[in-house]
Amino acid sequence: KIYPVLYVGGTIRLIDGLKDINVFFQAIDEAPFKVATFLVPDSIRMLLSFAKSKLSEYASKIDFIETGAAPISQEDMLQLCHVLPQSRLYNTYASTETGIVSTYNFNNGNCLSGCLGQPMKHSSFFITEEGLVGCKGKTLMSGYWNDMKTTDLIMQNDTVVTADLGYIDEQGCLRLQGRNDDIINIGGYKIAPTEIENVALSFPGIKDCVCIAAVHPVINQVLKLLVVPGMNYNRKELVSFLKSKLEAHKIPILYEEIEKVQRTFNGKIDRKSYR
């Protein structure tokens, strides 16, 4: 992402995440023209939670925001569209192994959850029999340095098969459903935790959450929802809300309040720490 900006004579300002939100707005203030930025979903949630009004004041100066690296909830997508009605807001599918494969402007009047758009001109994608996303194109890596064994696990015949579960909709857009290694098996049902999390995050009393597998003394493995509560959090109301939005086997049995959700350096939920 750095090279194209420098190639066309643009300026890049690097900031150390959103440890200080004021630094983010200061960087925009110092730019003589409109700006574009990449923000992981966790950073977007921070801006919406703590600086929504201020962000709206910068609407005319933000050309576009690109997000990726982790799933963004539809609730956050809708809020961002409301705050920045004229800005382009892109949800991008990319990785170190594949480069940028597709992107989707969800501020075009049709805000679709989990949608990552149609393939770029230099790329293509397909879905394997196992439901995994496969990628082809000029931006694929040639392999891991000095590690052909690991390379062969995900790359064959100039094709990278990811661990992402997804499908291609009627418009030819890629729709992600979660990670294959994150799927939770409950009574034979394979459940993507992101689906439960996205619905829960649309409940007004929740700041953040993570859905995990837990052991129940009677019915073995069940879903457990760890919740970072907001000011108006009510567990009974949350359960009723989830029951109105999800199928019965996707309703968490156990609930626990926590101070924060463990995340990786790039804003993804650190699911390994909950296993």
Report residues per predicted region.
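AMP-binding/adenylate-forming catalytic domain of the ANL superfamily
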Residues: L246-I269
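Conserved ATP/PPi-binding loop(s) of AMP-dependent carboxylate-activating enzymes
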Residues: Q118-H122, F126-I154, Y189-I191
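Conserved AMP-binding/adenylation subdomain of ANL enzymes
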Residues: K1-V35
